[in-house]
């Protein structure tokens, strides 16, 4: 996996991201274009008009993120609109068409702290577009995340100890003036606590499309289920746990229409709840949860199988909140292609504390 470290102004951060991951960004754009055009019933002209609306809203409401996106486009030698499309792919893919995928996410308090993790499942073709991105910004926590090249917010954690996960949901609708989910992920990754992340996202006045974001640290965690017309907060159960897959667990009201989540979303959720009932609280046992193949290939550790499972687990990430580290297994976690650990230096942690003062 390509590792990219960026620092400086938003434009400088974006330019370095774009130039370092130029090839991966080109492939990510090709994939996103094919996904959107292959599924939607809208015309090319309608899609281009919607993209212009999303870009204009982003430029007006979140200029710092838009500046970074412009920097990515310059570094990657692409059109700004193409990078905007990458960062609003969820809104196109799940707000306009019936795209479906699977991910499993858990937060768990333990006798010695808290653990958090995710299997990120998607089309196998996107695996080669994944990068490890580190972002250093003045006055904000340093971020380390796994993202698709060109996307400014995804799955990761920061030097303040805040970790963020992301699952697809399938509620119909797109509100161009709302907050895109990848920008919400970036906001969470720039926060010094889950509570701050929640307040930041809620204060934006609503989301553009549907998704689920989990934000946790050593002390607390929240899940945010949202659609273009609703945002619901999931809290930990009596055992200090949050489990989520790809269907709604909370009541979004009669106007929020959920569109045929993958049937295995329920089976994966139930299976993880069952596994956690016997969980002993150790880091080793928590890492093992993600290798489970019950109901293969539609399992927690998902596998591609023609005609049955169109995607696979592309990476697993486990956050150790006490140790302030994240272990990443690229590929299916029971047979990873690569394993590495993300940590922060004392200087990063000190800067994060100062940002919180």
UniProtKB/Swiss-Prot annotation:
Keyword annotations from UniProtKB, A to Z: Acyltransferase, Antibiotic biosynthesis, Peroxisome, Transferase, Zymogen
Keyword Acyltransferase attached: yes
Predominant localisation class: other
Gene Ontology BP terms: penicillin biosynthetic process
Disulphide linkage map: none
Pathway listed: Antibiotic biosynthesis; penicillin G biosynthesis; penicillin G from L-alpha-aminoadipate and L-cysteine and L-valine: step 3/3
Binding residue positions for 6-aminopenicillanate: 121, 310
Coiled coil: none
Pfam families per UniProt: AAT
Enzyme class: transferase
Gene Ontology cellular-component annotations: peroxisomal matrix
Changes after translation: The pre-AAT protein is synthesized as 40 kDa precursor which is then self-processed into an 11 kDa (protein A) and a 29 kDa (protein B). The B protein carries AAT activity.
Entry's family note: Belongs to the peptidase C45 family.
Subunit structure: The active form of the enzyme results from processing of the 40-kDa monomeric precursor to a heterodimer containing subunits of 11 and 29 kDa.
Biological function: Nonribosomal peptide synthetase; part of the gene cluster that mediates the biosynthesis of penicillin, the world's most important antibiotic. AatA catalyzes the exchange of the alpha-aminoadipyl side chain of isopenicillin N for phenylacetic acid to yield penicillin. This step occurs in the peroxisomal matrix and the penM and paaT transporters are involved in the isopenicillin N and phenylacetic acid import into the peroxisome, respectively.
Protein name: Acyl-coenzyme A:6-aminopenicillanic-acid-acyltransferase 40 kDa form
Organism, as annotated: Emericella nidulans (strain FGSC A4 / ATCC 38163 / CBS 112.46 / NRRL 194 / M139) (Aspergillus nidulans)
